[in-house]
């Protein structure tokens, strides 16, 4: 290909380009030759590309074949002879109407004038080689056979010709630009780096005698996770070179890579077509479509789609081959790809206007450094004032207690021997006693749940109770180090080394015995209790860290039992011994004799009684909550669903959680799970994913009593009250408060769940849906009452009591998961929301990360089938619901941008449940948008 120079323009005579239409360049063999309708002249088709830099590239010059197309082509419905190309170029031959209009203005005046005379006849045709060849062959066969059969074939071909013509005219500049982002064989992440250097490095790693084998091609080009697709790509590229090879050298690999990495959409489309068209006949049959669907499903880990490949292949053929010729061509594949967005009109992303965004993000304009710093400070104070005042009060109390003990012991005789080491140790001990008492309050769950419902929740951040618990634990560690460090390294040595005079004058009345040795001090009640407490604290604090609690530390057997939730749970019960030792340690003090000076028990009395009372309440309350299992289901992804009867006295809010115990698994362990049923349901349901020892054993116990699913029901195994085997007994305790229960405070909700993290929000969606239905029923009842009151006379009856109007106007639910089977967990809820939410209050977005991002060639056909099936049947092929499934991960910055644009000046509650990494990202994004826009995002993360 070379640029199309000005001198070349004089050789061709083009038709004009009308607004909004794509024209086909046709030329006679000599300049200035007039066009003849009866086909006396020989025509050629010239295909050119107009690049973004206004350069013109000549793509091909092909002879054109005239055919007679009957239809509504001309105003008088008569046949018109039109030049149709026989393409020999592997690329597509289309350009946008706007670019042709620019080009036509640059042509010589006489050429433009001649072209305009024929624009009405020529502007609707632009045929490719495959159609012309197929049409000629089929038409000849039909003419030879004669009769009605040949006429039917001709009619089918002519009908397809008209569809092709319309499809090519519809390929506007905007659709072509969108297409450039599609059918990528190399992901965007790889494009951001020097991909060829990586390929060369891989070539050097896998090459043998200067060649890499077909089996290593996938790893070489970075497609190791979709090896089957890479092998088909290798074969397609080899067929383009008329070869069938098992190995290629470095130069051939570069050639393959250049084709794969080609920026031209037409080139990528041709490669994709060649992958499907294995017999190279220019046609794709239903069997070939089925094979590529199975290949794409395998590459994207969609096992169910693979099983339904035949059904979806028939769907594609039905859409693209209405003439039932038994095959589709390249242009039809392109049409489906370019027009898929017209099918994807369900669960669309939020509406977005740049004007609204510019109004909402006024703060994005540049500010001075001082102004920016002051704005940041004001924002931090506004967003975190609850945390700031609570932490400030806590720190001030600790400082006050430390200074109180510091100066108190400075007046004692022992100070003359041990100095400031004693003062520091005693100050740290006082803060230690205070924090050992305070650390119990954040885990008094019943108390916290009750306080959430009081006005105190406006001033105290109860959502941060677990974080505050951890912060206090950190302060305890510091106090322990200071206290025991000063005693062992400073105070005890000074007592041992004190002169006889100093000991008798300043210390004898404390010990009432001869001067002790270092060992005497350590083996005394104070020393023994202190050392034991430190050992138990080290064990408990270590196993409570994130690395051990979440099994991030891999230990060899049998030490692997020291990691995981069970180790954390049981080791925390060592604090029962710690608190007993702490009280004993406070009784046997060296330097405090009167009972009222020994204040340890005073600090601990109330919190220990409160926490002990809560644990006792759990024991008796769990026994009073008599529940029986109604349904059990085990879904793909190792998720166990338990539906149980709802005790009369068990009242909860959406977003709350409860503790569950199964005596058949462990008579001691209680585990928290979000409630997935709505408060108005007559049952309680929870969803449990197998993540640890306890959940694994729980699933095993219930699997033994479950039965295979009946046809049409989801879930691998099921059980209910009719099951022959008796179901295991369950005990429940709760409900307990969680951040998500405050969703009613916000006008707009953004609910984000990762995997099983969707569970807190399912109850919220159900509750919202129930309220929506009630509001509609209430509106209908008022309407009926108004109509009836018009006909009533002298009635003094009251109008129906006005129910509380739902404050939430919009809810956006984003569910991100790795496995297709996960959508079975809440399929019923999603379908119910899609069916009953006529007002569009709830907008759901499912994201499947195992599928390659939209635009990747490996997921292109999946996207096409997804769009077609939903347009026809109203069901998403991936989730099996009416909610569209997006591929890869959401762009959270775009999500928040569109929300801030659509809901200016709104207060949006962002509720998240999932891994901490994304939680930090969302929290940071919320902070960024809050500083720069009028929309305020309030971030909440679930903690258990």
UniProtKB/Swiss-Prot annotation:
Query: Which part of the chain is the Ferric oxidoreductase domain?
Result: 426-583
Q: Which residues cross the membrane?
A: 388-408, 476-492, 528-548, 571-591, 600-617, 745-765
Record EC number: 1.11.1.-, 1.6.3.-
Assembly mode: Monomer and homodimer. Interacts (via N-terminus) with CIPK26. Interacts (via N-terminus) with SRC2.
The chain positions of domain EF-hand read 264-299, 308-343
- Which positions bear Phosphoserine? 354, 358
Q: What does its record list under induction?
A: Up-regulated by abscisic acid.
Query: Per the record, which residues fall in region EF-hand-like 1?
Result: 207-215
Q: Which organism is it from?
A: Arabidopsis thaliana
* SUPFAM superfamilies in the record: EF-hand (SSF47473), Ferredoxin reductase-like, C-terminal NADP-linked domain (SSF52343), Riboflavin synthase domain-like (SSF63380)
Name the positions where Ca(2+) 1 binds: 277, 279, 281, 283, 288
Task: Tell me which residues make up the FAD-binding FR-type domain.
Answer: 622-742
What regulates this protein's activity?
Answer: Inhibited by diphenylene iodonium (DPI).
Task: Pull the Extracellular topological domain ranges from the record.
Answer: 409-475, 549-570, 618-744
Q: What is this protein called?
A: Respiratory burst oxidase homolog protein F
Subcellular location field: Cell membrane
Q: What gene, per UniProt, encodes this protein? A: RBOHF
Supply one GO BP term: respiratory burst involved in defense response
Q: Would the keyword Plastid turn up in this protein's UniProt record?
A: no
Q: How does it sit in the membrane?
A: Multi-pass membrane protein
Q: What tissues has this protein been observed in?
A: Expressed in roots, stems, seedlings, inflorescences, leaves and guard cells.
Q: According to the UniProt record, what class of enzyme is this?
A: oxidoreductase
Q: Which residues form a coiled coil?
A: 102-126, 157-184
GO cellular component, alphabetical, reads: plasma membrane
**Cytoplasmic compartment spans:** 2-387, 493-527, 592-599, 766-944
Outline what the protein does.
Calcium-dependent NADPH oxidase that generates superoxide. Generates reactive oxygen species (ROS) during incompatible interactions with pathogens and is important in the regulation of the hypersensitive response (HR). Involved in abscisic acid-induced stomatal closing and in UV-B and abscisic acid ROS-dependent signaling.
Post-translation: what modifications?
Not glycosylated. Phosphorylated by CIPK26.
